[in-house]
C-alpha cells in the first residue's frame, strides 16, 4: 500500500495555516506519498467515518497564499478511550502532522504513544500556531500568524485612532490574547497609542479592574493637560484571566455561565465592559469625555498572510519534511531568524504537570520599557498640580505608583 501522511488542524484559525498545509503536502507529494487532510481535527480522526480530503499539487497551489484553513478545524480534545488504530493502519500512515497550539501538540504525543503500544509505528511532528505569540519558542522566533495579525490589527487600530482625532473622542480597544499581551502590545506600540494595558505590566502588583480604569484615566487627564482632547487605549483581553469571578461579576455586566459556573467571557465584548466601567468612573469624577468600544479579534484570524508569514510558513512546512527524514518525532518544528530548521521537544518546555507554560511579554526588556516609559501618556509627579483641576487626588492616578514601578 502507498505510504501516506495525515494533516489536521486544531484550535482556532491563524493566518498561514493554508501555507503550512500546502508546503507540507507539496514536498511529500513530490516523494510519492499520499497526503490526506483530516477535517474537524481530532474529532474527525477518531470518528466512525472520518471526513477527509486527498491533496494534489493543483489544490495545494490554489490554497497556498489564501487565509483561513482548507481543513475544517476543531477544539475537540479526545480522551484516551477514544483512540483507535483503524485509520492509521488502513491508510498506511507514516506521519501525523498537527497544526495548532500546545493542547494539539500534547494530544499528538498521547496518540503516538498509544499507537506504539499497539504496534503501529508513526512519527508525529507539530507546527506551532497562534496569533497570540505565546508558545515558548526560542527568543525572537514568533508563532506563525502573529506578524500578520499584528499588521492587520495595527491597520484597524490606526484607523480607530484617526477617528478619535477627527471626532474628538476616546476609544477603548480590546485585542485578543489568551494570557499574554503580545498582540495588544505590538498593535499599540506600532500605532503610538497613549495607553497600552497588558497582564505582564502588573508584575509588581495584583491586576484589578480598579487599577485598569485608573490607568486609562491617567492617560486621558495627561492628554488634557497637553491640550489633546482625543486618544485611544488598547487592552489585552488576557487581563481577564487574572481577575476573580467575584470581581468580574461586580462589573454588573450580564453574563451567561458555563457548566462549571464561570462567566462565559467569549460571549461578551471586553472593550464594551471596560468602556462602560470607564464612563461610570468619569461621571463620578465629573470629567467630560466621550469614549467608544472597539473589539479587535476574530477579524484577524482568517486574513491573507503577510509576506513574512508566507515565507515563514513555507519554511515550517518544508521543515516538517526535513525533520521526518531525520527520524524526528514528538517535536515541534521551528525556524530561527536565520531560517534554520530546529526541532523543539514538548518535554523541554512542559512543567511538572505536563502543561506548556505560555511565553509572556518580557516586561523588563529594553524594547518594552522604551515603549512604556517614552511612548505612553500618563500622569507622573510633575503633573500633579496641573491635574488637580480634574482630579482631587492626582497621585492615585500616577502610572508608576499604580503599577508599583520605580
Residue ranges: model-predicted function:
Residues 45-94, 103-105, 131, 141-151, ...:
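Glycine-rich oxoanion-binding loops at beta->alpha junctions
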Residues 1-46:
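N-terminal phosphate-binding or glycine-rich loops at protein starts, especially the Walker A/P-loop
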Residues 248-406:
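C-terminal non-catalytic interaction/assembly regions of soluble proteins
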Residues 35, 87, 98-100, 106-121, ...:
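Accessory alpha-helical/coil subdomains and C-terminal extensions
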